[in-house]
Amino acid sequence: MMVHFRFPFPGGEFPVSAQPEFELVARLHAAVVREEDVWQKRTP
């Protein structure tokens, strides 16, 4: 099973199994996006 992460730039999709060091980056990126969403909803 191949897991793909989408990043907001061209060519930002890659298989994690082929690029294990990108998994951490992808998880951090997803966490930052979630935090920004929460912050924007919290502030009027």
From Swiss-Prot:
Source species, domain of life: Bacteria
Protein's name in the database: Uncharacterized protein TP_0723
Species name: Treponema pallidum (strain Nichols)
Lineage: Bacteria, Pseudomonadati, Spirochaetota, Spirochaetia, Spirochaetales
